[in-house]
């Protein structure tokens, strides 16, 4: 299956002069749901773009999320609170895993997990660059493919994330048309494998 990245969008609504860490903690304490459009770019260690994608995401804390990749391939990622479902429409293949085994140390835990954020990450303010206020999160678990995650805020909004993995790749996520605490139907976080799809892991 092609690489899929568990990324999340959010809006923060606290003081503009707060650092990135304070903004993230305030969001986790107050936001229950979010949805947004996204564009995603993956670059290798030589800064060569190897993958571009776009789509729409939504989450409901704790532990429920959905990422719909619309281009260049149709792919779906769903966390239903207990299991993680990865569906590749082109391959007609579904991969399912227990959510707890894969969420720690990923952006899913950082943004859609529970309130114990510093159980999984070391957080620090990373200063201002490119007109954004940055936060850096380093996973405490060694059993993760991410070395660090940077989150860039403009005013009260998270507009960009950068994920650095153990293979030297950088994934950049840019957000638009986001909504904070929208009403989201519970059925959006339920995934039923399409009839005839190859299901791996269940």
Curated annotation (Swiss-Prot):
Family membership noted in the UniProt record: Belongs to the LolA family.
Keyword field: Chaperone, Periplasm, Protein transport, Signal, Transport
UniProt keyword Chaperone, yes or no: yes
Name of the featured protein: Outer-membrane lipoprotein carrier protein
Positions in coiled-coil regions: none
GO cellular component: a single term: periplasmic space
Any single GO BP term: lipoprotein localization to outer membrane
Described purpose of this protein according to its UniProt entry: Participates in the translocation of lipoproteins from the inner membrane to the outer membrane. Only forms a complex with a lipoprotein if the residue after the N-terminal Cys is not an aspartate (The Asp acts as a targeting signal to indicate that the lipoprotein should stay in the inner membrane).
Transmembrane annotation, as ranges: none
CDD domains cross-referenced by the UniProt entry: LolA (cd16325)
Domain of life: Bacteria
Leader peptide range in chain numbering: 1-18
Location(s), subcellular: Periplasm
UniProt KW Ribonucleoprotein keyword: no
Main location: periplasm
Subunit structure: Monomer.
